[in-house]
Regions:
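A charge-rich, low-complexity, intrinsically flexible signal that marks solvent-exposed coils, linkers
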Residues: 1-70
């Protein structure tokens, strides 16, 4: 599956799998951006992200993180 910036849920799942135990609220957006564009399935323009998109992905990842803790 090719991932684009709008695929927040899928990106969040990939980040949770790739960085287990990492609290996404402690990750800087610059690091998260780098991790996202490094995903093998990511096929979007790296310059097309913005703070709102990254916040959406961060919150989706945070939900995955909380689910893994319960």
């Amino acid at each position: 599956m090719d991932l684009k910036w709008q695929d927040a849920e899928e990106i969040a799942i990939r980040l949770a799998e790739g960085h287990p135990g990492t609290d996404p609220l402690t990750v800087r957006f610059t690091d998260m951006h780098a991790w996202i564009v490094a995903l093998s399935e990511f096929r979007d323009d790296p310059t097309k992200s913005n703070e709102k998109i990254l916040e959406t992905i961060q919150m989706a990842w945070h939900e995955e993180y909380l689910d893994s803790k319960s």
